[in-house]
Amino acid sequence: MGRRKIKMEMVQDMNTRQVTFSKRRTGLFKKASELATLCNAELGIVVFSPGGKPFSYGKPNLDSVAERFMREYDDSDSGDEEKSGNYRPKLKRLSERLDLLNQEVEAEKERGEKSQEKLESAGDERFKESIETLTLDELNEYKDRLQTVHGRIEGQVNHLQASSCLMLLSRK
C-alpha cells in the first residue's frame, strides 16, 4: 500500500496538528542537515510550534549563523544601499570570490584532463593482470591501493561539489 497525497490545508484537530508538526519539523531539520553537509553550507532555521514553543536548528550552530547574518545584512535592511553604495564592496568581494572559484574549476578540469591522458597512455596495464595468479599478500596490497585511489576520488568529488555549491551561492 503506497502513501496518500495529503491536501495542504491547516489541520483542524489540535492533537493531530501537534503530531504533524513534530514529524514535519524532524523532517525539515533532517533535510537542512543534509543540505549543510552536502554543500558545506551554514544555515539556521527557527520554527514555532502550534503552542508557541520555538524550535531551532543551526549548522554549525544557530548563534553563529544569526550573528553572521546580522553582520553581513545589517546595512542592507535600511533600503538605502543604492544611495550609500554599501552594496559595492560586497559585490566586489563576491565577484572576486567567483573569479577564484572559476580559476579553481578550470585548474581542476586541466588536472582531470591530464589524469585522463595518463590513464589512457598507461593502457590500464595495472588492471589487466590476472588476479587469480596473485598471492594473498599481493591481493591485500592490490586492495589497499584500490582503496587509496577510491578515497582520493571521493575526496576530489566532495571538493568539486562544495566548490560548485559555493559558486551557485555566490551568484545569488
Swiss-Prot record:
Expressed in pollen. It holds the Pfam family SRF-TF. GO terms for molecular function: DNA binding; DNA-binding transcription factor activity; protein dimerization activity. SUPFAM superfamilies: SRF-like (SSF55455). Residues 106-125 are annotated as: Disordered. It is found in: Nucleus. It comes from the Eukaryota. Keywords: Coiled coil, DNA-binding, Nucleus, Transcription, Transcription regulation. Transmembrane segments: none annotated. InterPro entries: TF_MADSbox, TF_MADSbox_sf. The keyword Nucleus applies. Residues 1-61 form the MADS-box domain. Residues 86-123 form a coiled coil. SMART domains: MADS. Gene3D superfamilies: Transcription factor, MADS-box. Probable transcription factor. This is Agamous-like MADS-box protein AGL29. It comes from Arabidopsis thaliana (Mouse-ear cress).
